[in-house]
Amino acid sequence: MANKEKGYLSLVLHAHLPFIRHPEYEDFLEEDWFFEAMCETYLPLLDIYERLTAEGTDFRVTMSITPPLCNMMADDLLRERFRRYYNLRLELAEKEVVRTRNTDFYEVAKMYETKFRRIRELYEDYYHGHILEGFKKFQEMGKLEIITCGATHGFLPLALRKEAVHAQIKLAADNYRKHFGRGPRGIWLAECAYNPGDDVFLKAQGIRYFFLETHGIIYGSPRPRYGVYAPVYCPSGVAAFGRDMESAQQVWSAETGYPGDHRYREFYRDLGYDLEYDYIKPYLHQDGVRRNTGMKYFKITGKVQLDQKAPYNPHEAREMAASHAGNFMFNRERQIEHLNHFLGKKPIVVSMYDAELYGHWWYEGTDFLEFFFKKMHHDQKTVKMVTPSEYLSMHPDNQVVQPSMSTWGDKGYSEVWLNGTNDWMYRHLHKQVERMVELANKFPAADGTLRRALNQCAREVVLGMSSDWAFLMTMGTAKNYSTKRFVAHTHRFNGLYEQIMGNRLEEGWLKDLEWRDNIFPEMDYRVFSTEEMEKAARS
Protein backbone atom coordinates (compact mmCIF):
# COMPACT_ATOMS: atom_id res chain seq x y z
CA MET A 1 0.00 0.00 0.00
CA ALA A 2 3.06 2.26 0.19
CA ASN A 3 3.82 5.02 -2.32
CA LYS A 4 0.26 5.30 -3.57
CA GLU A 5 0.39 9.10 -3.76
CA LYS A 6 0.17 10.49 -7.28
CA GLY A 7 2.45 13.46 -6.75
CA TYR A 8 3.98 15.93 -4.35
CA LEU A 9 3.32 19.41 -3.02
CA SER A 10 6.02 21.67 -1.65
CA LEU A 11 4.78 24.75 0.22
CA VAL A 12 7.43 27.49 0.35
CA LEU A 13 7.12 30.64 2.50
CA HIS A 14 9.57 33.50 2.03
CA ALA A 15 10.00 35.43 5.30
CA HIS A 16 11.89 38.69 4.84
CA LEU A 17 12.13 42.27 6.04
CA PRO A 18 14.95 44.75 5.47
CA PHE A 19 17.34 45.29 8.38
CA ILE A 20 15.71 48.13 10.32
CA ARG A 21 17.17 49.03 13.70
CA HIS A 22 17.55 52.57 15.00
CA PRO A 23 19.23 52.67 18.43
CA GLU A 24 19.67 56.44 18.04
CA TYR A 25 15.89 56.89 18.58
CA GLU A 26 13.72 55.83 21.50
CA ASP A 27 11.12 54.49 19.06
CA PHE A 28 11.04 54.40 15.29
CA LEU A 29 8.05 53.93 12.99
CA GLU A 30 9.65 51.54 10.48
CA GLU A 31 10.73 49.18 13.27
CA ASP A 32 7.00 48.47 13.62
CA TRP A 33 7.16 46.53 10.35
CA PHE A 34 9.18 43.90 12.21
CA PHE A 35 7.02 43.94 15.35
CA GLU A 36 3.82 43.61 13.31
CA ALA A 37 5.22 40.66 11.37
CA MET A 38 6.35 39.01 14.62
CA CYS A 39 2.81 39.29 16.09
CA GLU A 40 0.87 38.52 12.93
CA THR A 41 3.01 36.02 11.01
CA TYR A 42 6.17 34.59 12.59
CA LEU A 43 4.89 33.73 16.07
CA PRO A 44 1.45 32.61 14.77
CA LEU A 45 3.24 30.23 12.36
CA LEU A 46 5.18 28.75 15.26
CA ASP A 47 1.91 28.49 17.20
CA ILE A 48 0.47 26.40 14.33
CA TYR A 49 3.54 24.16 14.29
CA GLU A 50 3.26 23.68 18.07
CA ARG A 51 -0.43 22.70 17.90
CA LEU A 52 -0.04 20.37 14.93
CA THR A 53 2.89 18.61 16.57
CA ALA A 54 1.08 18.28 19.91
CA GLU A 55 -1.92 16.63 18.24
CA GLY A 56 0.18 14.33 16.06
CA THR A 57 -0.60 15.95 12.71
CA ASP A 58 2.36 15.60 10.37
CA PHE A 59 3.19 18.54 8.10
CA ARG A 60 5.93 19.78 5.79
CA VAL A 61 6.80 23.36 4.98
CA THR A 62 9.87 25.10 3.58
CA MET A 63 10.56 28.57 4.91
CA SER A 64 13.26 31.07 4.12
CA ILE A 65 14.28 33.22 7.07
CA THR A 66 16.53 35.82 5.52
CA PRO A 67 19.77 36.93 7.20
CA PRO A 68 18.43 40.46 7.99
CA LEU A 69 15.42 38.85 9.67
CA CYS A 70 17.64 36.42 11.61
CA ASN A 71 19.78 39.33 12.78
CA MET A 72 16.73 41.32 13.91
CA MET A 73 15.18 38.33 15.68
CA ALA A 74 18.43 37.80 17.61
CA ASP A 75 19.13 41.48 18.40
CA ASP A 76 18.89 42.41 22.09
CA LEU A 77 17.61 45.95 21.46
CA LEU A 78 14.86 44.84 19.08
CA ARG A 79 13.86 42.00 21.40
CA GLU A 80 13.29 44.51 24.22
CA ARG A 81 11.42 46.88 21.93
CA PHE A 82 9.25 44.00 20.72
CA ARG A 83 8.34 43.22 24.33
CA ARG A 84 7.27 46.83 24.79
CA TYR A 85 5.25 46.63 21.56
CA TYR A 86 3.19 43.54 22.41
CA ASN A 87 2.67 44.55 26.05
CA LEU A 88 1.18 47.88 24.90
CA ARG A 89 -1.07 46.02 22.44
CA LEU A 90 -2.21 43.66 25.18
CA GLU A 91 -2.98 46.60 27.49
CA LEU A 92 -5.04 48.25 24.73
CA ALA A 93 -6.89 44.99 24.00
CA GLU A 94 -7.78 44.58 27.69
CA LYS A 95 -9.19 48.12 27.75
CA GLU A 96 -11.12 47.40 24.56
CA VAL A 97 -12.76 44.30 26.04
CA VAL A 98 -14.23 46.56 28.74
CA ARG A 99 -15.15 49.39 26.35
CA THR A 100 -16.88 47.17 23.77
CA ARG A 101 -18.96 45.06 26.16
CA ASN A 102 -22.53 44.73 24.83
CA THR A 103 -21.51 45.93 21.35
CA ASP A 104 -20.93 44.21 17.99
CA PHE A 105 -17.18 44.53 18.55
CA TYR A 106 -16.87 42.63 21.84
CA GLU A 107 -15.95 39.29 20.24
CA VAL A 108 -13.28 40.95 18.12
CA ALA A 109 -11.80 42.71 21.14
CA LYS A 110 -11.75 39.39 23.03
CA MET A 111 -10.02 37.81 20.03
CA TYR A 112 -7.22 40.40 20.19
CA GLU A 113 -6.85 40.04 23.96
CA THR A 114 -6.49 36.26 23.59
CA LYS A 115 -4.09 36.71 20.69
CA PHE A 116 -1.70 39.08 22.45
CA ARG A 117 -1.70 36.93 25.60
CA ARG A 118 -0.71 33.98 23.42
CA ILE A 119 2.00 36.03 21.69
CA ARG A 120 3.48 36.88 25.09
CA GLU A 121 3.23 33.26 26.25
CA LEU A 122 4.95 31.94 23.13
CA TYR A 123 7.69 34.53 23.14
CA GLU A 124 8.49 34.37 26.86
CA ASP A 125 7.50 30.90 28.10
CA TYR A 126 8.13 28.78 25.00
CA TYR A 127 11.12 30.50 23.38
CA HIS A 128 12.45 32.77 26.18
CA GLY A 129 12.85 35.65 23.75
CA HIS A 130 14.78 33.55 21.21
CA ILE A 131 12.29 32.91 18.42
CA LEU A 132 14.91 31.37 16.12
CA GLU A 133 15.18 28.48 18.57
CA GLY A 134 11.52 27.73 17.88
CA PHE A 135 12.07 27.47 14.14
CA LYS A 136 15.25 25.46 14.71
CA LYS A 137 13.30 22.98 16.85
CA PHE A 138 10.86 22.16 14.05
CA GLN A 139 13.68 21.90 11.52
CA GLU A 140 15.37 19.31 13.74
CA MET A 141 12.05 17.39 13.87
CA GLY A 142 12.08 17.21 10.06
CA LYS A 143 8.78 19.09 9.66
CA LEU A 144 10.22 22.46 8.63
CA GLU A 145 13.09 23.09 6.25
CA ILE A 146 14.67 26.50 6.81
CA ILE A 147 16.49 27.95 3.83
CA THR A 148 18.59 31.07 3.51
CA CYS A 149 18.61 34.07 1.16
CA GLY A 150 21.24 36.55 -0.04
CA ALA A 151 22.92 38.36 2.87
CA THR A 152 20.79 41.49 2.59
CA HIS A 153 18.30 40.37 -0.08
CA GLY A 154 20.57 41.78 -2.78
CA PHE A 155 19.27 41.77 -6.36
CA LEU A 156 22.01 39.66 -7.93
CA PRO A 157 21.40 40.08 -11.71
CA LEU A 158 22.25 43.80 -11.42
CA ALA A 159 25.56 43.17 -9.63
CA LEU A 160 28.36 43.98 -12.11
CA ARG A 161 31.09 42.34 -10.02
CA LYS A 162 30.89 38.64 -9.20
CA GLU A 163 32.67 39.44 -5.94
CA ALA A 164 29.38 41.03 -4.81
CA VAL A 165 27.39 37.91 -5.74
CA HIS A 166 29.87 35.70 -3.88
CA ALA A 167 29.74 38.00 -0.83
CA GLN A 168 25.93 37.92 -0.67
CA ILE A 169 25.87 34.10 -0.81
CA LYS A 170 28.87 33.40 1.46
CA LEU A 171 27.73 35.81 4.18
CA ALA A 172 24.25 34.26 4.07
CA ALA A 173 25.56 30.70 4.42
CA ASP A 174 27.89 31.67 7.29
CA ASN A 175 25.09 33.50 9.09
CA TYR A 176 22.79 30.50 8.65
CA ARG A 177 25.41 28.20 10.21
CA LYS A 178 25.73 30.57 13.15
CA HIS A 179 21.99 30.56 13.89
CA PHE A 180 20.98 27.01 12.95
CA GLY A 181 24.10 24.95 13.58
CA ARG A 182 24.45 23.49 10.07
CA GLY A 183 24.77 24.65 6.49
CA PRO A 184 21.73 25.64 4.39
CA ARG A 185 20.45 23.05 1.92
CA GLY A 186 18.47 25.56 -0.09
CA ILE A 187 18.26 29.26 -0.83
CA TRP A 188 15.62 31.76 -1.89
CA LEU A 189 17.33 34.09 -4.35
CA ALA A 190 16.02 37.57 -3.51
CA GLU A 191 13.06 38.41 -5.77
CA CYS A 192 13.62 34.93 -7.33
CA ALA A 193 16.15 36.86 -9.42
CA TYR A 194 18.42 34.42 -11.23
CA ASN A 195 21.35 35.25 -13.47
CA PRO A 196 22.75 32.25 -15.39
CA GLY A 197 26.03 31.09 -13.88
CA ASP A 198 25.48 32.52 -10.41
CA ASP A 199 24.53 29.04 -9.20
CA VAL A 200 28.26 28.17 -9.00
CA PHE A 201 28.40 30.38 -5.90
CA LEU A 202 25.52 28.41 -4.38
CA LYS A 203 27.36 25.15 -5.03
CA ALA A 204 30.48 26.53 -3.32
CA GLN A 205 28.48 26.89 -0.07
CA GLY A 206 26.97 23.41 -0.27
CA ILE A 207 23.54 24.73 -1.30
CA ARG A 208 21.63 22.07 -3.24
CA TYR A 209 18.64 23.97 -4.65
CA PHE A 210 16.92 27.30 -5.30
CA PHE A 211 13.59 28.52 -6.68
CA LEU A 212 12.68 30.23 -9.94
CA GLU A 213 9.68 31.98 -11.39
CA THR A 214 7.86 29.86 -13.98
CA HIS A 215 9.43 31.39 -17.09
CA GLY A 216 12.95 30.95 -15.70
CA ILE A 217 12.43 27.20 -16.12
CA ILE A 218 10.14 27.21 -19.18
CA TYR A 219 12.58 29.35 -21.21
CA GLY A 220 15.55 27.21 -20.16
CA SER A 221 17.81 25.43 -22.63
CA PRO A 222 17.18 22.70 -23.58
CA ARG A 223 13.43 22.89 -23.08
CA PRO A 224 12.49 21.25 -19.75
CA ARG A 225 10.70 17.96 -20.40
CA TYR A 226 8.26 18.31 -17.47
CA GLY A 227 7.89 22.09 -17.34
CA VAL A 228 7.88 23.34 -13.75
CA TYR A 229 6.55 20.01 -12.41
CA ALA A 230 9.99 18.49 -11.87
CA PRO A 231 13.19 20.26 -10.82
CA VAL A 232 16.07 20.64 -13.25
CA TYR A 233 19.79 20.60 -12.58
CA CYS A 234 21.86 23.58 -13.65
CA PRO A 235 25.19 22.67 -15.29
CA SER A 236 26.76 23.27 -11.85
CA GLY A 237 24.65 20.44 -10.39
CA VAL A 238 22.48 22.75 -8.26
CA ALA A 239 18.75 22.02 -8.61
CA ALA A 240 16.19 24.65 -9.64
CA PHE A 241 12.51 24.30 -8.70
CA GLY A 242 9.95 26.30 -10.73
CA ARG A 243 6.91 28.09 -9.34
CA ASP A 244 3.44 26.70 -10.04
CA MET A 245 1.21 29.54 -11.17
CA GLU A 246 -2.14 27.76 -10.71
CA SER A 247 -1.77 27.41 -6.93
CA ALA A 248 -0.15 30.85 -6.73
CA GLN A 249 -3.11 32.60 -8.36
CA GLN A 250 -5.66 30.94 -6.08
CA VAL A 251 -4.06 32.75 -3.14
CA TRP A 252 -2.30 35.80 -4.62
CA SER A 253 -4.87 37.07 -7.11
CA ALA A 254 -6.49 40.34 -6.01
CA GLU A 255 -9.66 39.52 -7.97
CA THR A 256 -10.12 35.78 -7.50
CA GLY A 257 -7.77 34.88 -4.63
CA TYR A 258 -9.07 33.67 -1.28
CA PRO A 259 -7.90 36.72 0.75
CA GLY A 260 -10.38 39.00 -1.02
CA ASP A 261 -13.45 37.23 0.40
CA HIS A 262 -15.85 39.76 1.93
CA ARG A 263 -15.97 37.90 5.27
CA TYR A 264 -12.27 38.34 5.94
CA ARG A 265 -10.80 41.17 8.01
CA GLU A 266 -10.33 44.56 6.36
CA PHE A 267 -6.61 45.44 6.43
CA TYR A 268 -6.93 49.18 5.82
CA ARG A 269 -9.21 50.24 8.69
CA ASP A 270 -7.48 50.34 12.08
CA LEU A 271 -8.30 51.46 15.63
CA GLY A 272 -5.38 53.87 15.49
CA TYR A 273 -7.56 56.07 13.26
CA ASP A 274 -11.03 55.15 14.55
CA LEU A 275 -10.79 55.86 18.29
CA GLU A 276 -10.79 59.15 20.22
CA TYR A 277 -7.32 60.68 20.10
CA ASP A 278 -6.78 61.00 23.85
CA TYR A 279 -7.82 57.37 24.34
CA ILE A 280 -5.46 55.99 21.68
CA LYS A 281 -2.53 58.38 22.24
CA PRO A 282 -0.67 56.20 24.83
CA TYR A 283 -0.42 53.49 22.16
CA LEU A 284 1.06 55.71 19.45
CA HIS A 285 4.69 56.67 18.91
CA GLN A 286 6.21 59.60 20.79
CA ASP A 287 5.43 61.96 17.90
CA GLY A 288 1.71 61.39 18.62
CA VAL A 289 0.80 60.83 14.96
CA ARG A 290 -2.10 58.41 14.39
CA ARG A 291 -0.85 55.09 13.06
CA ASN A 292 -1.90 51.45 12.77
CA THR A 293 -2.18 49.51 16.02
CA GLY A 294 -2.77 46.14 14.35
CA MET A 295 -6.28 45.98 15.85
CA LYS A 296 -8.97 46.15 13.18
CA TYR A 297 -12.71 45.70 13.81
CA PHE A 298 -14.22 45.55 10.34
CA LYS A 299 -14.47 43.04 7.50
CA ILE A 300 -13.86 43.57 3.79
CA THR A 301 -17.67 43.64 3.29
CA GLY A 302 -17.42 44.37 -0.44
CA LYS A 303 -16.36 47.18 -2.75
CA VAL A 304 -17.52 49.92 -0.39
CA GLN A 305 -15.84 52.90 1.28
CA LEU A 306 -13.90 52.26 4.49
CA ASP A 307 -16.56 54.02 6.58
CA GLN A 308 -19.22 51.65 5.19
CA LYS A 309 -17.50 48.43 6.27
CA ALA A 310 -19.49 45.98 8.43
CA PRO A 311 -18.28 44.64 11.80
CA TYR A 312 -15.85 41.72 11.59
CA ASN A 313 -17.10 38.31 12.73
CA PRO A 314 -14.12 36.10 13.75
CA HIS A 315 -16.16 32.86 13.74
CA GLU A 316 -17.58 33.50 10.26
CA ALA A 317 -14.09 34.33 8.94
CA ARG A 318 -12.55 31.22 10.50
CA GLU A 319 -15.24 29.03 8.92
CA MET A 320 -14.43 30.60 5.56
CA ALA A 321 -10.72 29.88 6.05
CA ALA A 322 -11.58 26.21 6.66
CA SER A 323 -13.70 26.15 3.50
CA HIS A 324 -10.95 27.75 1.43
CA ALA A 325 -8.38 25.31 2.82
CA GLY A 326 -10.61 22.44 1.71
CA ASN A 327 -10.98 23.99 -1.73
CA PHE A 328 -7.21 24.49 -2.03
CA MET A 329 -6.62 20.82 -1.11
CA PHE A 330 -9.28 19.64 -3.60
CA ASN A 331 -7.70 21.71 -6.38
CA ARG A 332 -4.22 20.33 -5.65
CA GLU A 333 -5.58 16.76 -5.74
CA ARG A 334 -7.24 17.31 -9.12
CA GLN A 335 -4.20 19.18 -10.47
CA ILE A 336 -1.79 16.43 -9.44
CA GLU A 337 -4.04 13.64 -10.74
CA HIS A 338 -4.18 15.42 -14.11
CA LEU A 339 -0.42 16.07 -14.23
CA ASN A 340 0.36 12.49 -13.22
CA HIS A 341 -1.74 11.19 -16.11
CA PHE A 342 -0.41 13.76 -18.58
CA LEU A 343 3.30 13.52 -17.67
CA GLY A 344 3.42 9.81 -16.87
CA LYS A 345 5.27 10.47 -13.60
CA LYS A 346 4.67 11.90 -10.14
CA PRO A 347 4.81 15.70 -10.47
CA ILE A 348 5.91 18.14 -7.79
CA VAL A 349 3.83 21.30 -7.43
CA VAL A 350 5.83 24.11 -5.82
CA SER A 351 3.60 26.76 -4.21
CA MET A 352 5.59 29.88 -3.29
CA TYR A 353 4.41 32.90 -1.28
CA ASP A 354 5.67 35.75 0.85
CA ALA A 355 5.28 34.49 4.42
CA GLU A 356 3.87 37.85 5.53
CA LEU A 357 0.81 37.28 3.34
CA TYR A 358 -0.30 34.78 5.96
CA GLY A 359 -1.48 36.61 9.07
CA HIS A 360 -0.33 40.14 8.24
CA TRP A 361 -1.92 41.04 4.89
CA TRP A 362 -4.40 38.16 5.04
CA TYR A 363 -5.27 37.96 8.72
CA GLU A 364 -6.96 34.55 8.45
CA GLY A 365 -4.10 33.17 6.36
CA THR A 366 -2.57 31.40 9.34
CA ASP A 367 -5.94 29.74 10.09
CA PHE A 368 -6.06 28.71 6.43
CA LEU A 369 -2.63 27.08 6.70
CA GLU A 370 -3.51 25.21 9.88
CA PHE A 371 -6.73 23.85 8.37
CA PHE A 372 -4.86 22.97 5.17
CA PHE A 373 -2.16 21.00 6.99
CA LYS A 374 -4.82 19.10 8.95
CA LYS A 375 -6.87 18.29 5.86
CA MET A 376 -3.81 17.16 3.92
CA HIS A 377 -2.88 14.81 6.77
CA HIS A 378 -6.33 13.38 7.52
CA ASP A 379 -8.56 13.76 4.46
CA GLN A 380 -6.64 12.63 1.37
CA LYS A 381 -3.91 10.30 0.08
CA THR A 382 -3.40 11.65 -3.44
CA VAL A 383 -0.78 14.29 -2.58
CA LYS A 384 2.28 13.95 -0.36
CA MET A 385 3.72 17.12 1.14
CA VAL A 386 7.52 17.22 0.91
CA THR A 387 10.43 19.60 1.25
CA PRO A 388 12.66 20.07 -1.81
CA SER A 389 15.45 18.15 -0.05
CA GLU A 390 13.12 15.19 0.49
CA TYR A 391 12.09 15.26 -3.17
CA LEU A 392 15.70 15.29 -4.38
CA SER A 393 16.54 12.38 -2.08
CA MET A 394 13.64 10.36 -3.51
CA HIS A 395 14.16 11.49 -7.13
CA PRO A 396 17.86 12.28 -7.65
CA ASP A 397 17.79 11.87 -11.44
CA ASN A 398 16.61 15.04 -13.19
CA GLN A 399 17.16 16.76 -16.52
CA VAL A 400 20.11 19.14 -16.93
CA VAL A 401 18.87 22.54 -18.13
CA GLN A 402 20.37 26.02 -18.15
CA PRO A 403 17.55 28.22 -16.73
CA SER A 404 17.09 31.71 -18.12
CA MET A 405 17.42 35.07 -16.42
CA SER A 406 14.17 35.79 -14.60
CA THR A 407 12.54 37.29 -11.49
CA TRP A 408 9.12 37.05 -9.90
CA GLY A 409 8.64 40.82 -10.16
CA ASP A 410 6.13 42.62 -12.37
CA LYS A 411 6.75 41.66 -16.04
CA GLY A 412 9.21 38.98 -14.95
CA TYR A 413 12.57 40.71 -15.25
CA SER A 414 14.33 43.69 -13.62
CA GLU A 415 11.97 46.60 -14.23
CA VAL A 416 10.77 46.86 -10.62
CA TRP A 417 14.35 47.28 -9.37
CA LEU A 418 15.71 49.37 -12.23
CA ASN A 419 13.54 52.22 -13.51
CA GLY A 420 13.24 55.99 -13.44
CA THR A 421 12.49 56.09 -9.70
CA ASN A 422 15.65 54.28 -8.60
CA ASP A 423 18.20 54.08 -11.43
CA TRP A 424 20.27 56.85 -9.78
CA MET A 425 21.29 54.37 -7.05
CA TYR A 426 23.31 52.03 -9.21
CA ARG A 427 26.25 54.25 -10.14
CA HIS A 428 26.88 54.70 -6.42
CA LEU A 429 26.36 51.04 -5.62
CA HIS A 430 28.65 49.80 -8.40
CA LYS A 431 31.36 52.22 -7.29
CA GLN A 432 31.08 51.09 -3.67
CA VAL A 433 31.40 47.43 -4.66
CA GLU A 434 34.40 48.28 -6.84
CA ARG A 435 36.04 50.11 -3.93
CA MET A 436 35.19 47.32 -1.47
CA VAL A 437 36.87 44.77 -3.76
CA GLU A 438 39.86 47.11 -3.97
CA LEU A 439 40.08 47.29 -0.16
CA ALA A 440 39.72 43.52 0.30
CA ASN A 441 42.48 42.89 -2.26
CA LYS A 442 44.76 45.63 -0.88
CA PHE A 443 44.55 44.47 2.77
CA PRO A 444 44.52 40.64 2.77
CA ALA A 445 45.47 40.35 6.47
CA ALA A 446 44.44 43.51 8.32
CA ASP A 447 44.04 43.54 12.08
CA GLY A 448 43.13 45.93 14.91
CA THR A 449 41.23 49.12 14.12
CA LEU A 450 41.89 48.79 10.39
CA ARG A 451 40.23 45.38 10.35
CA ARG A 452 37.21 46.78 12.21
CA ALA A 453 36.94 49.61 9.68
CA LEU A 454 37.17 47.20 6.74
CA ASN A 455 34.49 44.97 8.27
CA GLN A 456 32.24 48.00 8.74
CA CYS A 457 32.83 49.02 5.12
CA ALA A 458 31.58 45.58 4.09
CA ARG A 459 28.49 45.97 6.30
CA GLU A 460 27.65 49.34 4.74
CA VAL A 461 28.05 47.95 1.21
CA VAL A 462 25.80 44.94 1.76
CA LEU A 463 23.18 47.08 3.54
CA GLY A 464 23.17 49.38 0.51
CA MET A 465 22.73 46.35 -1.78
CA SER A 466 19.34 45.45 -0.24
CA SER A 467 16.74 45.16 -3.01
CA ASP A 468 14.15 46.60 -0.62
CA TRP A 469 15.31 50.20 -1.15
CA ALA A 470 14.79 50.07 -4.94
CA PHE A 471 11.49 48.20 -4.49
CA LEU A 472 10.09 50.76 -2.03
CA MET A 473 11.07 53.62 -4.35
CA THR A 474 9.20 51.96 -7.22
CA MET A 475 6.12 51.28 -5.10
CA GLY A 476 6.14 54.83 -3.70
CA THR A 477 5.67 53.46 -0.16
CA ALA A 478 8.24 54.58 2.42
CA LYS A 479 10.06 56.28 -0.46
CA ASN A 480 11.67 58.89 1.78
CA TYR A 481 12.85 56.29 4.27
CA SER A 482 14.33 53.98 1.63
CA THR A 483 16.09 56.91 -0.05
CA LYS A 484 17.53 58.10 3.27
CA ARG A 485 18.74 54.62 4.11
CA PHE A 486 20.53 54.14 0.80
CA VAL A 487 22.12 57.59 0.97
CA ALA A 488 23.21 57.00 4.58
CA HIS A 489 24.96 53.71 3.79
CA THR A 490 26.61 55.31 0.75
CA HIS A 491 27.86 58.24 2.84
CA ARG A 492 29.14 55.96 5.61
CA PHE A 493 30.98 53.68 3.21
CA ASN A 494 32.59 56.54 1.29
CA GLY A 495 33.68 58.23 4.53
CA LEU A 496 35.31 55.05 5.82
CA TYR A 497 36.93 54.36 2.46
CA GLU A 498 38.54 57.80 2.38
CA GLN A 499 39.75 57.45 5.96
CA ILE A 500 41.26 54.02 5.29
CA MET A 501 42.99 55.12 2.08
CA GLY A 502 44.24 58.30 3.80
CA ASN A 503 45.44 56.35 6.84
CA ARG A 504 43.49 58.63 9.21
CA LEU A 505 40.79 56.53 10.87
CA GLU A 506 38.45 58.31 13.30
CA GLU A 507 37.76 55.60 15.86
CA GLY A 508 34.88 57.52 17.47
CA TRP A 509 32.95 57.63 14.20
CA LEU A 510 33.79 53.99 13.50
CA LYS A 511 32.39 53.01 16.91
CA ASP A 512 29.21 54.96 16.18
CA LEU A 513 28.73 53.12 12.87
CA GLU A 514 29.38 49.74 14.52
CA TRP A 515 26.68 50.64 17.05
CA ARG A 516 24.16 51.78 14.43
CA ASP A 517 24.73 49.21 11.66
CA ASN A 518 25.57 46.10 13.68
CA ILE A 519 24.35 43.45 11.23
CA PHE A 520 26.66 40.44 10.81
CA PRO A 521 28.86 40.68 13.93
CA GLU A 522 30.83 37.80 12.37
CA MET A 523 31.66 39.87 9.23
CA ASP A 524 34.99 39.17 7.50
CA TYR A 525 35.62 41.85 4.86
CA ARG A 526 37.73 39.41 2.81
CA VAL A 527 34.47 37.91 1.53
CA PHE A 528 34.79 40.63 -1.15
CA SER A 529 38.28 39.61 -2.28
CA THR A 530 38.76 38.56 -5.89
CA GLU A 531 40.78 35.54 -4.77
CA GLU A 532 37.91 34.24 -2.59
CA MET A 533 35.41 34.79 -5.39
CA GLU A 534 37.55 32.94 -7.94
CA LYS A 535 38.14 30.07 -5.53
CA ALA A 536 34.37 29.73 -5.02
CA ALA A 537 33.69 29.89 -8.77
CA ARG A 538 36.14 27.01 -9.35
CA SER A 539 34.79 24.77 -6.58
Show where each model-derived region lies.
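Active-site-proximal, glycine-rich beta->alpha crossover segments in alpha/beta enzymes
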Residues: 77, 81-140, 146-159
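Acidic (Asp/Glu)-rich catalytic clusters
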Residues: 2-5, 50-58, 130-147, 166, ...
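Active-site and substrate-binding clefts of carbohydrate-active enzymes
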Residues: 2-60, 65-107, 118, 222-539
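Hydrophobic, small-residue-rich alpha-helical packing segments that form membrane-like cores
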Residues: 193, 198-207
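Aromatic- and glycine-enriched glycan-recognition loops and surfaces
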Residues: 35-48, 125-130, 167-172
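CE4/NodB-like, metal-dependent polysaccharide N-deacetylase domain
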Residues: 165-189, 331-343, 347-352
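His/Asp/Glu-enriched short active-site or ligand-binding loop at hydrolase and phosphoryl-transfer sites
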Residues: 208-220, 386
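Conserved short loop/turn motifs at secondary-structure junctions
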Residues: 184-194, 354-358, 478
